[in-house]
């Protein structure tokens, strides 16, 4: 298992709020918790930034982290990420903040310590552009959205 440096920024982490862990041996994502002093109520359509109390430094440029919504919160309550997906670059060292958006119909209260997002680590390839006049022909060509049909 790859080791990622983590710094605890809020003393309640590990005392009141556990460090992120994988829920099962097959889990892809680590659950991130709301490191809040008080509950935060999100009205429909509202967004807020929620601290995690943690900073990570991936250091390896062949890796990045992605923050994703938790499926139950999104499906049952309309709570998703305000930026849809959060990308954490390998050289970022600041606090992990979660942009939370209530796209649901009802207000939702985020409780201190509540699991509100998940983080996965993904491989990264840094590519360099090769300037060309034309591309080699493919079956698809320039076919865009809906090109392959629905059936």
UniProtKB/Swiss-Prot annotation:
Query: Which Enzyme Commission number(s) are on file for it?
Result: 3.6.1.23
Q: Which keywords describe this protein according to UniProt?
A: Hydrolase, Magnesium, Metal-binding, Nucleotide metabolism
Top-rank taxon: Bacteria
Q: In which pathway does it act?
A: Pyrimidine metabolism; dUMP biosynthesis; dUMP from dCTP (dUTP route): step 2/2
Annotated residues for binding of substrate: 70-72, 83, 87-89, 97
Q: Which CDD domains match?
A: trimeric_dUTPase (cd07557)
Needed cofactors: Mg(2+)
- Reaction(s) the record says it catalyses: dUTP + H2O = dUMP + diphosphate + H(+)
Disulfide bonds, which pairs? none
| GO terms (BP aspect) | dUMP biosynthetic process; dUTP catabolic process
Q: What class of enzyme is it?
A: hydrolase
What GO molecular function annotations does the UniProt record carry, in alphabetical order?
dUTP diphosphatase activity; magnesium ion binding
Q: Which Pfam families match?
A: dUTPase (PF00692)
Instruction: Please report which protein family the annotation says this sequence is part of.
Output: Belongs to the dUTPase family.
Which HAMAP family does this UniProt record tie to the protein? Answer: dUTPase_bact
NCBIfam families named in the record: dut, PRK00601.1
Name the job this protein performs: This enzyme is involved in nucleotide metabolism: it produces dUMP, the immediate precursor of thymidine nucleotides and it decreases the intracellular concentration of dUTP so that uracil cannot be incorporated into DNA.
Can you say what this protein is called? Deoxyuridine 5'-triphosphate nucleotidohydrolase
The organism's taxonomic lineage, starting at the top: Bacteria, Pseudomonadati, Pseudomonadota, Gammaproteobacteria, Enterobacterales
